[in-house]
């Protein structure tokens, strides 16, 4: 029975899988009719396909860009814009002065002959003057100064300008410890493989003066090694034998404690020192001993922005250890039994200021006659003004243009006399205010009279003329009193009175104090 069922099932499956024979194949008429239907269907499908492809092509042409299969043409406006941007870039980076020198080389009339020494010097002077005039006409901010045919300073590039801005922020906002470590350049070995960092007097000046760039290769914790015990190695500090810096000991070098003390001396006026001395002069004789002087120095240092900002850093070795022992010996004698008078200390302060001014003057490289240019003198006056770069360059260019042809230069004595006049700037401010209230104009003769009356110093006509050129904006030969006084006060104080922070913490402290002391309004309801 099962065998029979198996055979039936296999036969049924074979019948299902066997191809079915069409009867229409055996009839020729039916074959012709079927072929006609197939041709009609194929023609109809071809027409539909052609129509749909045409519609698709039309739709792609109207709405799309063939999906990136066809190269896209750049519009002419875009090409012109790209050419314009590229031209601006090339104009900005190209050294046009060099291009001008290449296209128009200088040809001397006596090129075939060797001129004499005098003619050579005169020729160099004339060519250098013409180069200076061309540079001043081309750029207002050119920093080229000529002394007897010698070029002193080249134009400051982008990299140097950014470094100077960074160093100015260090001077303004950093702690005294970091300022000292950045601008100090000397490292002296001591016992047990340890080293102590020192400043030279030039480093001390650089740490205070904005715009003075630290030499390449020297910076934060980067120093030159110097061994005082080495016979063949000597430091040339360009100081006089009786310099005040040699009284500090350490071969005329400045330690961190000396740095703090000297900044304190420079940042406090004579009047404030006199008051501090009288406060600690218990017997009223005008003298103080060593212990009283330590208290005076501590009190005065705490009143300065530098003193409030300083924190001892034991890990760097920069801790304030009090007044230098060599200075203590200079003030109070080897046995510490002498008294320090206010006159002796003020003489020390005046001598320190005079040496700093001399270093500034010598840094401008005076000519053979010992004079610096009027533009250099203007730069020294405006060093601490805090002007924007364009405003400062405008004033300097006005001075260069004014004294280009008949400049006599500024001697060292005229320079020191003018800054002796500035040491009495508060009294000068009072005197000029009286003139202004009385309705009198402040001309050059008035300023000379005030200097003679207040500071007991005779200002030369040429120095006063340069000062009026700097601060006389409208060329009416009248001094702008407020601007002159504010700039000169900053110059005397060398920016040391400015706070060493951005003011954000002070503002937040004021906000918290106000919120703490103010009663909420809801409590009054």
UniProtKB/Swiss-Prot annotation:
Residues 130-141 have a biased composition (Acidic residues). Calcium sensor of the mitochondrial calcium uniporter (MCU) channel, which senses calcium level via its EF-hand domains. At low calcium levels, MICU1 occludes the pore of the MCU channel, preventing mitochondrial calcium uptake. At higher calcium levels, calcium-binding to MICU1 induces a conformational change that weakens MCU-MICU1 interactions and moves MICU1 away from the pore, allowing calcium permeation through the MCU channel. Also required to protect against manganese toxicity by preventing manganese uptake by MCU. It is found in: Mitochondrion intermembrane space; Mitochondrion inner membrane. Gene3D superfamilies: EF-hand (1.10.238.10). Keywords: Calcium, Calcium transport, Ion transport, Membrane, Metal-binding, Mitochondrion, Mitochondrion inner membrane, Repeat, Transit peptide, Transport. Ca(2+) 1 binds at residues 281, 283, 285, 287, 292. This is Calcium uptake protein 1 homolog, mitochondrial. The EF-hand domains have high affinity for calcium and act as sensors of calcium levels.
